């Protein structure tokens, strides 16, 4: 078989067709703290100096990021994340409320009050307060989510932009904030989950509004680029180690109808590879996600009991899989790496519909030489 382009390889893999080999990539960029550690462990400084900033769409805000573009250095298949701004416009004024030599408490551009430990960019901040407490707050913040605001699209959005994307041979990926993720960003996890029971009418309004907002915000983008958008991810993070934050019953009542609307719009425009991004153990919700039009999951966090081999056996070709390489095994060393890869890749490569990737961001406790060994060993199974 002749060598495929990254896009051809991705699409063949995701459609259970033959490819020259599996894609080699990290589905999430390698973060700053990890790169800083690797520079002390052998990563050439020349590979970092001069790197341009890339755009990375985070949960609610599109932002310019200092993530290192590792595609060329490691020989990854390129995956480009499209930038549509699904965040509040105008942004909230970022301001510092308290600062010491150890931490800083601030209001961020999304309106969230949080505590940041100085000198650490990897990991989660401590979230302290959110903008929405009740229906009055919700009605007020809704004004910041106008799908017709032209600032939501790239500055160079034009016919030339479209023509340029049609010439690319790598994967084009659109990330959007999902329904649970949005409620969490607006209210905080515990208050939002409580709202499903304490004020179901408010929850229903948030879910309905968000489905309409997503569709109308991306409508021109999707209807113009159509199937040149190779895949879509709906970011949720609605599970933890021991299961989802909400029950299947709650998902079915509040989220399933909205999932069907969004995925129906995407599929109508030729986009049929639709992932949900959720850390933790999301297994109880998989049948409902499939019913809602989703056909892929990542990052399949091993520490939460997610296992790609088991999922492939249970769901067959109905479910696409990305991730599930245990970050802890890569940190441990060669023997653990070989066991992790050897126990999964032979079967998953044969069955198809799977792309190996570490089961979240590459953390700074993975030594550089371990990561290089992991990639070299992984290539034997692609």
Describe the function of each predicted region.
Residues 88-104:
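Short acidic, Pro/Gly- and aromatic-enriched capping/linker segments at domain boundaries
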Residues 1-45, 98, 104-107, 113-120, ...:
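Active-site loop segments of alpha/beta catalytic cores
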Residues 35-93:
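Segments that shape or occlude catalytic/ligand-binding pockets
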Residues 85, 120-121:
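Residue-level detector of alpha-helical segments with a strong bias toward transmembrane helices
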Residues 124-125:
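Compositionally biased intrinsically disordered low-complexity regions
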């Amino acid at each position: 078989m002749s060598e495929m382009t990254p896009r051809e390889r991705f699409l063949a893999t995701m459609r259970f067709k033959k490819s020259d080999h599996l894609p080699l990539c990290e589905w999430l960029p390698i973060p700053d703290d990890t790169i800083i550690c690797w520079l002390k462990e052998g990563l050439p400084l020349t590979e970092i100096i001069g790197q341009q900033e890339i755009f990375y769409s985070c949960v609610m805000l599109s932002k310019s990021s200092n993530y290192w573009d590792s595609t060329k250095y490691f020989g990854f298949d390129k995956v480009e994340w499209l930038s549509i701004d699904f965040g509040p416009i105008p942004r909230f004024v970022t301001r510092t409320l308290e600062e010491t030599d150890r931490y800083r408490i601030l209001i961020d551009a999304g309106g969230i009050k949080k505590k940041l430990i100085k000198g650490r960019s990897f990991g989660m901040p401590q979230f302290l307060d959110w903008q929405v407490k009740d229906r009055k707050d919700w009605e007020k913040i809704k004004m910041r989510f106008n799908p017709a605001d032209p600032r939501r699209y790239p500055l160079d959005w034009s016919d030339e932009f479209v023509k340029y994307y049609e010439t690319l041979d790598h994967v084009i990926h659109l990330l959007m904030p999902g329904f649970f993720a949005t409620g969490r960003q607006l209210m905080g996890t515990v208050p939002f989950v409580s709202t499903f029971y304490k004020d179901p009418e408010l929850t229903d309004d948030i879910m309905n509004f968000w489905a309409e907002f997503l569709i109308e915000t991306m409508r021109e983008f999707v209807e113009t680029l159509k199937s040149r958008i190779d895949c879509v991810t709906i970011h949720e993070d609605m599970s933890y180690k021991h299961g989802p934050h909400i029950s299947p019953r709650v998902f079915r009542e509040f989220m399933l109808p909205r999932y069907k609307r969004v995925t129906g719009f995407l599929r109508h425009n030729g986009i049929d590879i639709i992932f949900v991004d959720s850390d933790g153990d999301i297994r109880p919700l998989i049948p409902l996600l499939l019913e809602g039009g989703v056909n892929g999951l990542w990052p399949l966090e091993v520490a939460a009991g997610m296992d790609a081999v088991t999922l492939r056996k249970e769901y067959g070709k109905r479910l696409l899989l990305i991730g599930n390489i245990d970050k802890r095994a890569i940190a441990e060393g060669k023997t653990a790496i070989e066991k992790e890869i050897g126990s999964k890749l032979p079967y998953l490569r044969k069955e198809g519909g799977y792309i190996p990737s570490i089961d979240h961001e590459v953390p700074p406790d993975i030594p550089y030489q371990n990561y290089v060994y992991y990639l070299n060993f992984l290539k034997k199974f692609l």
